[in-house]
A protein has these predicted regions:
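Walker B catalytic acidic pair
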Residues: 331
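Bacterial N-terminal signal peptides that target proteins for export
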Residues: 1-9
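Bacterial signal peptide processing site
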Residues: 22-25
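C-terminal motif of bacterial Sec signal peptides marking the signal peptidase cleavage site
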Residues: 16-20
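Predominantly extracellular/secreted Zn2+-dependent metalloproteases
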Residues: 28-324, 335-415
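Short, intrinsically disordered, low-complexity terminal segments
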Residues: 9-12, 30
């Protein structure tokens, strides 16, 4: 006798619907499950509307459409419900993924099951797929390898079905480690509203630069999620003492620890030092779920604050590949809420976030411990048609005096 689990799902157009599910235990040992076919997203029919986002010659208006182009840095592989019967699949990554499983979760059924299995998803891919549950009755694989059979469902209201992604791909494993939940997008509000006396304060970006920016922010988010960064951030006073010892000085140069936005009396070494609890809170401001608008400047200064963080074209094209993250770290700190009075933004007073993050970032490149370390995955530096400057292939070198190299001596890779 078939074991049926029935429950009610909310719908936009229907009052309720009873759904039947049967699991392995009700089928017997001889049941042979027939799962949905796997999908190669590099070879999709036109009905799936496959495309590559951020093609070099794509109109910039598309990347500036914040209703269509956005992602959270810890979820570069994005699955969004479209209407009551379809999903939009997008990958915000310069490198594709293999062996990707998209799981679904229904109300009142506590197990996730595989609704799509992609053998390949190419870089910056987007396509659309019908939710198989609306097509008819199917077998689905549960996380534990067992099978559940679900009857046809006519459609789903927003939020009635939840999607999540898993993959055995080593790149995806790095994505999963990212703690930051920043919502990343591009905004044209800055360059379209330049002041009359500074017409190049902000410059428009294009898909070539957007791809570099996306690559950089994923790497940056990984770096500030890294155990070495967290340990150094939480124990910044120890880091400063280690710097002094390495330099052979008896006293720490500048502030002894993190301090906030209040005006300081550096001459008398008076700072508004943060407590341990406040330092933990400060760390969370770097990784919370606020919106980040990435932009580009053309004037004498980069800018950050509120949702904005920006830098010059060179930072996007070559700088981040070489680990030159000082400007970006500074503006990202303004975006996270810190002023020039705080060493969380300011590089002065013996060094602060700008200096420490840059050293750490370079050490992670040295360890090959970022999601992306090869500038040739994009070759943005070669695409002179879309750039204002002329660039050579970025070549990374590490300073033998890098404090993380001195301390960890090639160890500390995230395992």
């Amino acid at each position: 006798m078939r074991k049926t689990i029935s429950y009610v799902l909310p719908f936009a157009l229907f009052a309720s619907l009873l759904v039947g599910c049967s699991d392995d235990d009700s089928k017997g040992d001889n049941y042979k499950a027939e799962y949905l076919a796997s999908i190669d997203a590099t070879n999709l029919p036109k009905e799936n509307r496959p495309m590559t986002m951020f093609e070099d010659n794509e109109s910039s208006s598309k990347m500036y459409d914040n209703k269509d182009r956005w992602f959270r840095v810890n979820q570069p592989m994005q699955v969004i419900q479209k209407g009551k019967d379809s999903v939009q699949v997008s990958l915000y990554s310069p490198v594709g993924l293999t062996d990707v499983k998209v799981y679904a979760k229904l109300p009142n059924y506590d197990k996730r099951f595989v609704v799509y299995e992609f053998t390949k998803v190419p870089a910056f891919h987007r396509s659309f797929h019908q939710i198989p549950l609306v097509e008819g009755k199917h077998d689905y694989k549960l996380e534990d390898g067992k099978t559940v059979t679900i009857d046809k469902i006519d459609g789903f209201s927003s939020g009635a079905i939840q999607f999540s992604v898993e993959s055995s791909d080593p790149l995806f494993e790095k994505f999963k480690r990212i703690k930051s939940a920043r919502l990343v997008q591009f905004s044209d509000q800055y360059h379209l509203n330049n002041p009359a006396d500074d017409p190049n304060k902000f410059l428009p970006m294009n898909p070539v630069l957007a791809k570099e920016a996306i690559t950089m922010i994923i790497n940056y988010s990984y770096a500030i999620s890294h155990p070495l960064y967290y340990d150094t951030f939480i124990n910044f006073d120890r880091y400063k003492q280690e710097q002094a010892a390495t330099a052979g000085t008896a006293t720490v140069n500048g502030a002894l620890n993190w301090h906030g936005n209040a005006d300081d009396d550096a001459a008398n070494a008076v700072y508004d030092y943060l407590t341990k609890a406040q330092i933990e809170t400060a760390y969370n401001t770097y990784i919370d779920n606020r919106t980040l608008n990435m932009a580009m400047v053309g004037g004498n200064s980069a800018w950050g604050g509120g949702p904005l963080a920006s830098q010059w074209e060179s930072g996007y094209v070559t700088g981040h590949w070489k680990g030159e993250m000082s400007v970006w770290s500074h503006e990202y700190s303004h975006h996270s809420g810190y002023s020039h009075s705080s060493n969380l933004a300011n590089s002065g007073e013996g060094g602060g976030q700008q200096e420490m993050l840059t050293h750490l970032y370079k050490y992670l490149i040295y360890l090959n411990d970022l999601p992306f370390t090869d500038p040739d995955v994009l070759k943005g530096y070669t695409k002179t048609t879309y750039l204002t400057g002329t660039y050579k292939k970025p070549v990374f070198t590490v300073d033998p005096k890098n404090p993380f190299l001195i301390k960890y001596k090639g160890e500390g890779k995230w395992k």
